[in-house]
Amino acid sequence: MKMLFAIPGLPVSDIEKSTAFYRDKLGFTVAVRKEGFAKLRRDAVEIHLWEAADEGWRTRVGSEPIVSGAESFIAGTGGCRVSVEGVEEWYRVVQPLGILHDNAQLEVTPWGTREFAVVDPDNNLVTFFERK
């Protein structure tokens, strides 16, 4: 048995707004779009977005656990790392867009990468990195 790759699924509060962000700001194409879900691709990278907009937890009664898996408080709790070639060039493209994470400018890391991170409209963290 050998694992081959992973596809991140990021929880978002507004699927339309988030799909537009990944398409318009980061250059992804929309491969699949249906209610509450989007599959996005750019080159060999695929990211899935799923809408976490269930507000039912706010008004529920009793002590039953919250179990829909799409509760609104989950939106923005995700993140992923994307390996790229030409991270410095990509940083120059992304920097003027105003989407960089405040504490994740382009840097050399102790674990041997050059990387930076952006945040989507829900504050999911997407880190772009290149091995040195």
Predicted segment positions?
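Vicinal oxygen chelate
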Residues: 1-7, 29-85, 89-119, 130-132
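Conserved active-site tyrosine of GNAT-family acetyltransferases
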Residues: 18-23, 94, 123
